[in-house]
């Protein structure tokens, strides 16, 4: 069943729409990210998906309508992890130009290397305080250029 929402409609009707898809299964991290992104720039539309398989499903739906300006993926999610999602996205060439950032509590060099090889722009560690989260969110937003 297609997931239709205001973000999809806006992405379709308004080229350059500031829409970010975030794969995050932790409700606390979702709430913190939503708060910080909104505080930095409330013009962004944020959509959270809580498992890897649904991230792929949602992106395939968007492929027909509009594209996110940024994809942020938690590394450790149910059904597919961040690296597995990146691998799936390699089969969908339309997403090649969409920046993808992995964020994780794991500082594994192996995870980071694999994700960068699979097309992530960066692999960032989830910060432990609001100042760090704000810095990471600003950094993530820097990848989301309206001119893409």
Identify the meaning behind each predicted range.
Residues 73-75:
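Active-site residues of response regulator receiver
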Residues 1-21, 27-42, 64, 129-148:
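Non-catalytic signal-transmission and effector/linker regions of two-component phosphorelay proteins
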Residues 48-70, 134:
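Acidic, metal-coordinating helix/loop segments flanking the phosphotransfer/catalytic sites
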Residues 121:
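Short, glycine/charged-rich "phosphate-handling" switch motifs in NTP-dependent
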Residues 126:
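A Lys-centered signature of the CheY-like receiver
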Residues 77-79:
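Receiver (REC) domain active-site loop signature in two-component systems and cognate sites
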Residues 101-103:
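Hydrophobic/aromatic residues positioned on beta-strands within the core alpha/beta folds
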């Amino acid at each position: 069943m297609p997931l239709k929402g205001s973000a999809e409609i806006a992405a379709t009707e308004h080229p350059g729409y500031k829409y970010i898809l975030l794969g995050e299964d932790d409700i606390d991290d979702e709430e913190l990210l939503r708060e910080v992104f909104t505080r930095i720039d409330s013009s962004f539309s944020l959509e959270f998906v809580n498992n890897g398989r649904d991230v792929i499903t949602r992106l395939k739906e968007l492929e027909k309508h509009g594209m996110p300006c940024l994809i942020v993926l938690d590394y450790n999610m149910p059904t597919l992890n961040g690296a597995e999602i990146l691998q799936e996205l390699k089969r969908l060439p339309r997403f090649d130009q969409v920046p993808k950032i992995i964020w994780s509590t794991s500082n594994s060099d192996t995870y980071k290397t694999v994700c960068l090889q699979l097309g992530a722009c960066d692999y960032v560690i989830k910060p432990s305080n609001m100042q760090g989260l704000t810095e990471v969110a600003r950094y993530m937003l820097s990848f989301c250029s309206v001119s893409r």
